[in-house]
Amino acid sequence: IDYNSYYDIFYSELSLVSVKKSHPLYVKWYIEHYPKSKGIVGRQLNYLIYYDNLPIGIIGLSSPPLNYKIFRNYFQTDNEKLFLNNNVFRIVRKPNDSNIGTKILKILRTTSPRDYHERYGDNLLGIVTFVEKPRTGSIYKADNWDYLGETQGIEVKRRGDDWFQKQY
């Protein structure tokens, strides 16, 4: 099966378009969603979500937080360049499709490994995400993501020479 053709057939009205983090619409919707953000650092894949050829939202992947043992254990690697964090997922103009979120995640899961390899030369093992309350992560559950547990709620401060060696 040619999966690219498969998704074009079933989701022809839905697509992800890769953009730079400086794309004006991406920036606008990202800052509206995370007004206190200091920006995106590290490796990243940023997409505008299109439905019927109109932009309806954004989704992005970026380098994960450093030293999360649970992620490294799950992916069985100490190389944190082999998995990404779903750092933003925002639908601004929701179409009349109750499964739109899950469809977007499915396209992201199938296209991001290719995009990541083309951009960085590494094979992407997977994607992680954090879901903050009151959200429940229902779209991730519907897309069959594995639940790894709740975060400890630790804020990482970049202080001292060894901040990057701490494990959480």
Question: Where in the sequence are the language-model features?
Answer:
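Short amphipathic alpha-helix that is part of the acyltransferase structural core
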Residues: 1-43
